[in-house]
Design a protein with these regions (language model features):
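Short, solvent-exposed loop/helix junctions and linker helices
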Residues: 1, 17, 66, 77-81, ...
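Short, conserved catalytic or interaction motifs in soluble domains
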Residues: 60, 100, 152
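A cross-family signal for key residues in well-ordered alpha-helices
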Residues: 24, 73, 88, 129, ...
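Short, glycine-rich, amphipathic interfacial segments at transmembrane boundaries or analogous
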Residues: 36-74, 126-144
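A hydrophobic, helix-centered structural microdomain
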Residues: 1-59, 89, 155, 160
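A short, structured surface patch at a secondary-structure boundary
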Residues: 65-123
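C-terminal terminal-structure detector
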Residues: 7-9, 119-160
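Short, hydrophobic secondary-structure boundary micro-motifs
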Residues: 24, 38-39, 98-100, 106, ...
Length: 160
């Protein structure tokens, strides 16, 4: 049922998010040039890797991330518009609207058995950890929220 609701929500709201995505892509292209997208291997359900696509927010290069992040990129991240391409992953069945955020596959060996439970569900565009503190949380707190979500997942929790 969750999958059906995810797809329905993405399709029904496409009239809003597709034009926003096209506009954001044009802004990235004007500010940073090509490539427009940032692609990275992330761990999905059951730890299966998939290629996550986001709008690029940084200049390319070897400098630290803080130095490569542009003003446009900072704005895209603050508004979460950089994550609009992830709606495509929801349509493909690689992600859900709500679930633990997908992390790079290189972290898989570092999870404790309890933390690895976050992969029992599809990763989400937003998650319980993001709703309850986002970047102000420690990694331990984020993983605890992720596992709590896995244990308590419901339509009403997603709507909340």
């Amino acid at each position: 049922m969750k999958r059906v609701l995810d797809v329905a929500a993405v399709v029904l709201t496409a009239v809003v998010w597709v034009p926003l995505l096209l506009l954001a892509m044009a802004v990235v292209w004007a500010a940073l040039g090509r490539p427009i997208f940032f692609v990275q291997e992330r761990a999905g359900r059951d730890g299966r890797p998939f290629r996550l696509v986001k709008l690029r927010t940084m200049r390319e290069g070897d400098a630290p991330d803080a130095e490569r992040l542009t003003r446009v990129g900072r704005w895209l991240r603050a508004t979460s518009l950089d994550e609009l391409p992830e709606l495509w992953h929801v349509l493909r069945g690689e992600m859900s609207l709500v679930g633990p955020r997908p992390l790079p596959v290189r972290y898989l060996p570092r999870y404790s058995p309890q933390q690895a439970r976050r992969h029992e569900v599809r990763p989400g565009i937003t998650g319980w950890a993001q709703v309850n503190g986002r970047n102000s949380l420690t990694w331990e707190q984020k993983f605890a929220y992720d596992v709590w979500y896995v244990d308590h997942m419901s339509f009403w929790l997603d709507v909340k």
